[in-house]
């Protein structure tokens, strides 16, 4: 049975669930929430976790205990800016990576974008700044 309790522990993304609404907040404010490997990985993990607990995947509005499955996901960023894009340091370091390391990075980004695109919840971007 799918449980709404115990979301994965993350450092750079906070998760708040209120009934059928899930709010994911990027928490890398000092870097304008720029995407680094850790932030991308945490977002992918949370996209997977929330998708499995969605009405779209479960085919039901509530679990057997009456707890609602997710229908809406709100994505926002802490501070003045939503997300500055890729972290410049990560991009700089990619120039020194091997082809295999860059392939793995590309697959990680593909998983991020496809996880968002294919997510079964209605997705709202609360965007401010850049």
Region locations from a protein language model:
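Short strand->helix junction
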Residues: 32-33, 81, 130
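Histidine-centered beta-alpha loop that forms part of the nucleotide-sugar donor binding/catalytic region
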Residues: 27, 86, 128-129
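Short beta-strand/turn micro-motifs composed of small residues
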Residues: 76-77, 127
């Amino acid at each position: 049975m799918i449980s709404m309790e115990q979301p994965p522990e993350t450092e750079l993304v906070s998760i708040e669930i209120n009934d059928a609404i899930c709010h994911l907040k990027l928490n890398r404010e000092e870097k304008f929430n720029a995407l680094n490997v850790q932030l991308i990985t945490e977002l992918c993990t949370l996209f997977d976790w929330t998708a499995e607990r969605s009405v779209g995947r479960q085919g039901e509005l509530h679990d057997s205990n009456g707890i609602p499955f997710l229908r809406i996901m709100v994505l926002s960023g802490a501070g003045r800016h939503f997300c500055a894009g890729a972290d410049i340091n990560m991009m700089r370091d990619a120039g020194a990576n091997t082809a295999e390391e860059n392939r793995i990075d590309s697959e990680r980004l593909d998983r991020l974008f496809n996880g968002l695109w294919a997510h079964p919840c209605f997705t709202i971007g609360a965007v401010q700044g850049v």
